[in-house]
Amino acid sequence: MKSTDTTGDSSLRLELNVPNCVTALRVVLAAIIGYLLYQREPGALFAAGILLIVAASTDTLDGILSRRLGQETPGGALFDLVADELLFMPSLILAIVAGLFARTDGLMPLNPYLYAVPALAGGVSVLAGVAVFLRKRRTRVFDFPSPPPVAKANYWFWMAPLIVAVLGVGPDSFLAVLMYLALISTILTFYAYLKKGSYVFTD
């Protein structure tokens, strides 16, 4: 467990700055995307797919801005993690309910759950980790584990099949390959987080 002092950068206060505003935009877009996916109409699904690309891109943009503007904060990092899951998890569930992964039936066993269940479990684990961290930090100060390199790529491995399924583009086999790659990436990311950040749950 890494301990830090209680001053300066260790504060979890969510500051009103440009990167956090970009992250907040992702949360707003997540709500709009959820509404569009719920409609299940071709035009709404196309708009949802485009907005998914835009919203997912803000995950990269807010990170770049926070580094270049010198506005990296622990609170902003946690907000970014939560915003990622607020975008991905409801969108994936609504896409499954809408039958957008049905075209890979026969190409993936237990379609689409072999892809979806581990991905959703990963998202739940992240949110649980944030909740436990915030609870424990009331009595002592320690760092939340920074995402391992594989986790940064993993988010796009999660999003790629979702975007392709929502837009309905590409061959069915291409979507299936993306889903298998997402499964592999999820397993590797879970192991990396378990190895690096298990102290959040155990200490």
Give the location of each predicted region.
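Short, hydrophobic transmembrane alpha-helix segments
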Residues: 35-43
